[in-house]
Amino acid sequence: MDNFSYIVADDNTREAVVVDTGAYVDTIIAKALNNNLNIKYIISTHEHSDHTAGNKDLALATNAKIVAHRNSRIYKDIAVEDGNIIKIGEIEIRIIHTPGHSKDSICLLAENKLFTGDTLFVGECGRVDLPGGSVTELYDSLFKKILTLEEDVEILPGHNYGTKPYSTLNYERKHNYVLQRRTREEFAKFMSSN
């Protein structure tokens, strides 16, 4: 199970955001130093430890603020909600609350890149059988939020479960079997059978 951590940086100010630290603190710090980046925020797409294990250590090393959805049970300096904007330099990162995998799941839209955490993967979607999971909330998150975005949006998931590490919304809409048009009831039945 490969976890992905991402660094989003403004080229002019060198301010950066880390999306999902995972257990990669040393690697993240090295990349930030090598690229002369100032990590301003650590954003967790959800509270599961495989995405948040390094939050406190990275925050201590960089003085970055930890950001998570207000429903998240992890330590956070900044609580966010759907529609909030986190800004680094000229880059605006829009918070999209996407519950389903967990109550606190969020996706982050930065320009045409969507960091999906465990909400949507290449060719798959997040599990709903863990505490806080909800098939109806995942349906709404996928079909009423994510699928309303522009087709050229790049999907950058929290894990490498697919045939490739990233995709586009247009490709996923056409090829991801989870995203085939279904009613909420059909989706619930489909998810319970997989």
PLM region spans:
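Active-site HxH/HxHxD metal-binding segment of metal-dependent hydrolases
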Residues: D2, T13-A16, T21-R94, K174-V178, ...
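Core dinuclear metal-dependent hydrolase active-site scaffold
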Residues: I7, I85-A110
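Histidine-centered catalytic micro-motifs
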Residues: I42-T52, I96-K103, I155-G162
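Short, compositionally biased "basic patch" segments
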Residues: M1-I7
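Residue-level signal for inorganic ion chemistry
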Residues: V8, D20, L58, D118, ...
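Metallo-beta-lactamase
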Residues: S102-N194
